[in-house]
């Protein structure tokens, strides 16, 4: 199996945060005291085109490309009907490739990821990940999400070192690891194997921050990559 070795878009900042917040804005009559949540969206389907994302019938995100992740947007806490269509399509005409009712609680931070495949038997699989790290002023926190639908369970290790995460299956997100600040080189191995199948380019981790690394795309089709993101 030969995953591509490029890092993809490190973080796709699409200028959509303002649009997302505006589309879900708290009505003026409600008032600023209402509780809010923070939400971002990741496109992890390697054979899917850019997509538009709707919530409760309003377009929130336009032309989100594969291997891109938005900034967090602050939205009113509550339940939303999330629908995803190919870029330029409408929810009335479709095709709607994801339709899910999601609840974003007061004070929460959430990443919503599209994973899986558009053409294959697995289909498109939405993933919902709570982003609630605990501050680590001296070091950093790092976790990993295995969102590559056709990859086996994996271990993650410093290059040439012992695994720090073991037997992580598809759809799983690890706990945060406490690590020292600074650059780190990591590799992905098949669970239980000493051989690397993918080397993550150097991550420069700054003290006091928390990060997620998302493995996305298709391992077999060569769209596998890892997208790092700051869990602000």
Q: What is each model feature region?
A:
Residues 1-6, 29-33:
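Basic/polar N-terminal segments that are highly enriched at the extreme N-terminus
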Residues 3-16:
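Bacterial N-terminal signal peptides that target proteins for export
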Residues 22-30:
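C-terminal segment of classical bacterial N-terminal signal peptides
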Residues 31-232:
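Intrinsically disordered, low-complexity polar regions and short flexible loop motifs
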